[in-house]
């Protein structure tokens, strides 16, 4: 058992991997902070964050404050006597009083190559930007939004099949590796590198309306949205006054001469849609009220799909 006392703060799936890696290395997790349970699903039943479920399974103490700005909540955290706090997609702002608690500071695993893509959804931003490389930064958290100095970074190529969950899983593991390497150097931590604020970019929260297709944009951009916004909010258009979700797509350059939003049934079982540049081939899709299916299966039930305009 490593004697270093760690408080872990994280909420979604992304945070599971570094927490598991800390536990596997025998670190003493003296407390796990995660977001409060939220209503989810059609029944709106309270659902715990993924990190809470893992923490309880491992017998760890779980804390779910609505905010860490209250002195009484800060006193509880201080009472855990953490040497270091590790943050991975926690979702709450940490005031300066919290940042000052651990002797070795607050370490944050941020899934982008900082200062690029500061903000809440850097993985989606990486895919939307069409970047060739994705990455993760291990930084010292400070009061600004992802502005703290960086201890280490690692980059990986973005694959054509990467979606936000797939890419996030890979970055979570790499971030965990960076974290373990840095923790092994305590108490002799290296000097972190200041970020170049002049090169900083930001990307905020993803909202549902971002999933609405604008057929006046290039097919390559729409396809990136399909991968970036999977599984939520998804990418969608309309057909026959029903929502049509695009689950998987591929940009093409076939020179079919289609107008933006115009459908062409190609080679009998493929769906091409015109855009501002090139065609978007829809590979998997889901019509409102129906199950998700391949383009070929969809066309078997929609014999008049050729030539229609989507989103009108």
Curated annotation (Swiss-Prot):
Transmembrane segments: none
GO function term, MF aspect, one: methionyl-tRNA formyltransferase activity
Major enzyme class: transferase
Gene Ontology CC annotations of this record: cytosol
Reaction(s) catalysed by this chain's protein: L-methionyl-tRNA(fMet) + (6R)-10-formyltetrahydrofolate = N-formyl-L-methionyl-tRNA(fMet) + (6S)-5,6,7,8-tetrahydrofolate + H(+)
Superkingdom as given in the UniProt entry: Bacteria
Keyword list, A-Z: Protein biosynthesis, Transferase
UniProt EC number: 2.1.2.9
Keyword Iron-sulfur among record annotations: no
Entries under InterPro entries matching the protein: Fmt (IPR005794), Formyl_trans_C (IPR005793), Formyl_transf_N (IPR002376), Formyl_transf_N_sf (IPR036477), Formyl_transferase-like_C_sf (IPR011034), Met-tRNA-FMT_C (IPR044135), Met-tRNA-FMT_N (IPR041711)
Binding site for (6S)-5,6,7,8-tetrahydrofolate: 112-115
Family indicated by similarity: Belongs to the Fmt family.
Function of the molecule: Attaches a formyl group to the free amino group of methionyl-tRNA(fMet). The formyl group appears to play a dual role in the initiator identity of N-formylmethionyl-tRNA by promoting its recognition by IF2 and preventing the misappropriation of this tRNA by the elongation apparatus.
Record-given protein name: Methionyl-tRNA formyltransferase
Gene behind this protein: fmt
